[in-house]
Amino acid sequence: QGTDVSKLDYDTLVLCEDPGTTLIEEFTHKKTYNNMNRQLLTTKEGLKKATRKYAMKLRSDLILTSDNFLEYFDKFEARGNNYNLFKHKILTDVLFTRYNIKTGKFENRVIIPFHISDWWLFGLKEDLNTYFMDTELVKEPEFTRYFNLEDNREKLSPYGRARFKFAPEQYFGYSCFARNFDDIYMEDAADYSEELMEKFRQALVNNFIILEFKQSGIYLNKYPCSKNEKFSGDQYIGLYNFWRYENEYKKYCDNTYEITTKDSFFENEKLGYSKLRVYKHISKLTDSSTTCTAKLEQLFIGIPISAMCYLIDVLKEQLGTNKEQK
């Protein structure tokens, strides 16, 4: 409410009372806010106005280059026996549906259960209702500053400087499945386990289909990597990309399924991680929003150093293989 919509072209206008926003972190030239309550409220109010069998929830700044995503809606129909919730699987994006994440406080990558992309979702309206409508708005600022509260300061959040109880994507995913399955529980984002991750893996592949840009035709100008997810750099290793989704589908849903993709980044994760660092610097170099100074840094520092590190890792790997053969 109160937004100037005089220049917008729309069929139905949904105005909501603003639940407000909360500051996540502040830098010299930038402030980052948690707008999760705004997103959740507008999504729920939008679904109330939707009148057709199918619905699509998406960011207003996403660009649809085609309707290719519809070709996948009736694929991957098989399901496993556990955590079947939706009437039909929901389509969503690889960015940022996470398997694990790398943060500075942890030596190894950390699993992130129920972190499902909130960029866009397409499916039966009744299934999107199941996913969102009973999810409650959170109490702020306690939610966003959760790991700064006295009782939680000793906990290790997987999200680094961000101190929220859950990332928005994880809050939506976890809330939905926790209220529908009694054996799913997380106190906060630091409360994860291999057992819980196993439940999430089954829930995800039984209820969602994860697509990359080349399958969906949907991207976001704000993130140039959304046209080629490998340009997200080393975090690509931790995403539920289409290759990982196909493998999970074969494991949990249909062991006769023939995988159609091949991803060299996962055949050797260490080398894949190193190679993706090069991709990340190339992405920054080609990003139109990158300053000239930053482009020069990528060209003469970032790319050469990351490429050299990758070549060193390749040589180490090759030397190790030769020793084993001898």
Where do the PLM segments sit?
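Active-site-proximal specificity loops/subdomain of glycosyltransferases
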Residues: 2-49
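Short aromatic/hydrophobic "clamp" motif used to bind/position activated sugar donors
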Residues: 55
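Short acidic donor-binding/metal-coordinating loop in glycosyltransferase active sites
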Residues: 58-62
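Catalytic core and acceptor-binding pocket of nucleotide-sugar-dependent glycosyltransferases
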Residues: 64-258
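Membrane-proximal basic amphipathic "stem/tether" segments
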Residues: 239-326
